[in-house]
Amino acid sequence: MARNKIALIGSGMIGGTLAHLAGLKELGDIVLFDIADGIPQGKGLDIAQSSPVEGFDATLTGASDYAAIEGADVCIVTAGVPRKPGMSRDDLLGINLKVMEQVGAGIKKYAPNAFVICITNPLDAMVWALQKFSGLPKNKVVGMAGVLDSSRFRLFLAQEFNVSVQDITAFVLGGHGDTMVPLARYSTVAGIPLTDLVQMGWVTKERLEEIIQRTRDGGAEIVGLLKTGSAYYAPAASAIEMAEAYLKDKKRVLPCAAHLSGQYGVKDMYVGVPTVIGAGGVERIIEIDLNKGEKEAFDKSVGAVAGLCEACIGIAPSLKQ
């Protein structure tokens, strides 16, 4: 039986980490693509040379021609410019929109049956544009955001309570930006809701709000520390979790930027919501009940994403279709 084929479009820090993780998990053969010739080939060769030590079997190749991604089962898109200190994700819009147009054309031509995971920022607007540029089915194009944001929330909670990260569940909804909505009411420690833990004296409401704000600022905190780039280990791990759910038909319940067609009162936009990911791509969108405050925060986040999509249309009017 032929191995799955995974195309990594963009071979920067996230792309290289994706290739390593996909190899370690033996998810399939891996193609690293980048317009900067030599970088994908070099990283592919370097990671391949680690396979005898780490004990995985996968073919890794690098390319600067989209023809190399032909027939890919999964495409993970990281191409574009990363954030630098003082920049918001939204500052990247104009540059990365042009990149998405090129990437969309490449995927449409060579990998039209792939499950596509977009990581490029500003995430919600870029995945929306990528789906339109590529013409792929909406359930086969998703954005990686919620898994990462929820992972950050889970880590901070585990550190606060001094418990294992494995015992924390957390949900973050909305756009991947300053308006994201970490949902304390739907987050638990070993099944115990955070709201109950406040009543039990484990944490104050004020401290919990500080953790929620740190989650919102999670990416910016790392950008500020690195000074020359943005996060790559956790984003790569998050995207690999999504790819694995698709390739192995795991039916994982994962928050991601999915296309909404009326759910949560949102139409023709990509926003972070809980989904079921299996062999059919996004097989289901889970609509959870939101209280008044949560709904207001979610709607504010949706409004921010809508503004970015409108800005995209201003740059590329063809997206209005």
From Swiss-Prot:
Amino acids binding substrate: R83, R89, N121, R152
Entry's Gene Ontology molecular function annotations: L-lactate dehydrogenase activity; L-malate dehydrogenase (NAD+) activity
Active-site feature positions: H176
Gene3D superfamilies, A to Z: Lactate dehydrogenase/glycoside hydrolase, family 4, C-terminal (3.90.110.10), NAD(P)-binding Rossmann-like Domain (3.40.50.720)
Key words, A-Z: NAD, Oxidoreductase, Tricarboxylic acid cycle
InterPro entries: L-lactate/malate_DH (IPR001557), Lactate/malate_DH_C (IPR022383), Lactate/malate_DH_N (IPR001236), Lactate_DH/Glyco_Ohase_4_C (IPR015955), Malate_DH_type3 (IPR011275), NAD(P)-bd_dom_sf (IPR036291)
CDD domains: LDH-like_MDH
EC number annotated for this UniProt entry: 1.1.1.37
Binding locations of NAD(+): G10, S11, G12, M13, I14, G15, D34, N96, I119, T120, N121
Region forming the signal peptide: none
Catalytically driven reaction(s): (S)-malate + NAD(+) = oxaloacetate + NADH + H(+)
Disulfide bonds: none
Superkingdom, natural source: Bacteria
Gene Ontology biological process terms from the UniProt entry: lactate metabolic process; tricarboxylic acid cycle
Role noted for this protein: Catalyzes the reversible oxidation of malate to oxaloacetate.
Family: Belongs to the LDH/MDH superfamily. MDH type 3 family.
Name by which UniProt lists this protein: Malate dehydrogenase
Gene: mdh
